[in-house]
Amino acid sequence: MNSFAVFGNPIRHSKSAEIYALFAHEIGISKEYNLKLAVQDNFNYLLHNFFKLGGLGANITSPFKENAYFLCNQLTERAEKARSVNTIKKLKNGTLLGDNTDGIGFISDLKRLNWLDNNNQIISNDAPIPMVTNILLIGAGGAAKGIVPILLTTITTCHINIVNRTFSRAQELTSYYQEIGYKNISCLPLYKLRYDTNKYSLIINATTSNIHNTIPKIPYFLITPDTKCYDLFYTKQDTLFITWCKKNGANYCADGLGMLVGQAAHSFLLWHNTFPTINPVIDHLRSAFYM
């Protein structure tokens, strides 16, 4: 088989195969990359069978990143910390190495957007510059797990506040990161945001709300003209979350297409030991949306 694939549900909308093809063309290789629709009952079987039949590498997307974590024989440090896997490589001895490139892909996109300065601090037009950079993270699933560790280690002045529709999941995630040494992280029941007096420099939607045609229920007053609003999801037009943020005064908004390409580039690096060019692929996908 000697192929690559992405596993998820839904999967029809995925741009991963197109991204891989563009990267592969750049460095002059030719490999198959397929979309694999799975459900919870057959994900483990499909993944193992893919590698048994000669698969070399796989991307894992929602909702299977946490499942994949437990199926790998070895884990990179960032996958271990995230307890979530979005990239798997079959090693020469036949074992599976799990990695999580979501976090590094997210940080690379913040830099591409010029939202981070040379010291990896979020750029602010406010004066004075806040001593603590407050980040609101909406969601506590696999996508959120992938970005928390690198946010805390890269943006050294940040404090992350996690909210989630099911508060117990936010508590579990917060407790885990506190136990492994990250102190600048807390959580809050979603309804208590109406009493929150923090000024957030960055608000991240790490939920799948757009798939369900909804937006996270957060108060409009958390949005200021200087707030950076990022939706890990991406669509042809603005996501519902970004539309809502703009309506409430946000001047800095981005969807997750740049992060998608960034994390895919780091997956490609793991598989082929070559780092592809990111920006032309983002530009190509953006233009293709409107053709």
Curated annotation (Swiss-Prot):
It holds the Pfam family Shikimate_DH. Keywords: Amino-acid biosynthesis, Aromatic amino acid biosynthesis, NADP, Oxidoreductase. GO terms for cellular component: cytosol. The active site is at 65 (proton acceptor). Its EC number is 1.1.1.25. The keyword Amino-acid biosynthesis applies. CDD domains: NAD_bind_Shikimate_DH. Signal peptide: none annotated. Shikimate binds at residues 14-16, 61, 86, 102, 234. GO terms for biological process: amino acid biosynthetic process; aromatic amino acid family biosynthetic process; chorismate biosynthetic process; shikimate metabolic process. It catalyses: shikimate + NADP(+) = 3-dehydroshikimate + NADPH + H(+). InterPro entries: Aminoacid_DH-like_N_sf, NAD(P)-bd_dom_sf, Shikimate_DH, Shikimate_DH-bd_N, Shikimate_DH_fam, Shikm_DH/Glu-tRNA_Rdtase. One of its GO terms (molecular function) is shikimate 3-dehydrogenase (NADP+) activity. NADP(+) binds at residues 77, 139-143, 164-169, 232, 256. Pathway: Metabolic intermediate biosynthesis; chorismate biosynthesis; chorismate from D-erythrose 4-phosphate and phosphoenolpyruvate: step 4/7. Involved in the biosynthesis of the chorismate, which leads to the biosynthesis of aromatic amino acids. Catalyzes the reversible NADPH linked reduction of 3-dehydroshikimate (DHSA) to yield shikimate (SA). Belongs to the shikimate dehydrogenase family. Homodimer. This is Shikimate dehydrogenase (NADP(+)). The lineage of its organism: Bacteria, Pseudomonadati, Pseudomonadota, Gammaproteobacteria, Enterobacterales.
